[in-house]
Amino acid sequence: MENQEKYNNLSRLVEKLKKSDDPKRKYEYILWLGKKLKEPDNVIFVEENKVKGCVSEVFVKANIKGGKLFWEGYSDALITKGLLAFLITGLNELTPNEVVKIDKKLSLIHI
């Protein structure tokens, strides 16, 4: 992956989860991230930002400033909110091209 430092936030989060073999600790960490997620502006709560097909109420919005993505999100379910916080923290301030190039080894699938 080019310019690895751009992906430090995502790498740090993935490594934190990989460190523990205890699923309960991983779950608690995701819940903790969800509790820390900043409440978004009310403008996010529109139909076009709603994640379709999810049992929980989930809203996600990306804004581009200076060529970089800045994410906002909300979920009424804490585990979903934690996963959303994981992605927002890991993907914030990357360019769209950088997001597309993320190595699959950093994905949640491998944790």
Residue spans of the language-model regions?
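Alpha-helical support elements that line or immediately flank enzyme active sites
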Residues: 83-95
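Helix-adjacent hinge/juxtasegments
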Residues: 60-61, 72
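A short glycine/serine-rich beta->alpha loop
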Residues: 68-77
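Conserved small/polar residues in nucleotide/adenosyl-binding loops
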Residues: 109-111
